């Protein structure tokens, strides 16, 4: 019985040691992958397409406004056969940004009155 108990403890110890080493290997790989993704995102962030500019080359490259990212909207101009794509802000998001800005200003006034 003592032999079985000793063997079980040894087996659990070896298993936990090997699992810890495997996790360390995965952590190192994850860190390297995360760093490369961050570098790519930083490079991509510098290359965003401003509002009302052509985004047909990359429809996910529109810049962010204060709160929301602009959307690449495509349409056919009147009397034209070519599709035109530009980065635009949807109206509902524009109104939400205006409301958030007014709420910030109102919050500042309340702080000034009571603060």
Curated annotation (Swiss-Prot):
GO terms for cellular component: extracellular region. Residues 21-44 form a propeptide. Disulfide bonds join 48-63, 55-72, 62-87, 74-85. Keywords: Disulfide bond, Knottin, Secreted, Signal, Toxin. Expressed by the venom gland. It is found in: Secreted. Transmembrane segments: none annotated. GO terms for molecular function: toxin activity. Residues 1-20 form the signal peptide. InterPro entries: Spider_toxin_CSTX_knottin (IPR019553), Spider_toxin_CSTX_Knottin_CS (IPR011142). It holds the Pfam family Toxin_35. The keyword Cytoplasm does not apply. Coiled coil: none annotated. The presence of a 'disulfide through disulfide knot' structurally defines this protein as a knottin. Belongs to the neurotoxin 19 (CSTX) family. 01 subfamily. This is U3-lycotoxin-Ls1a.
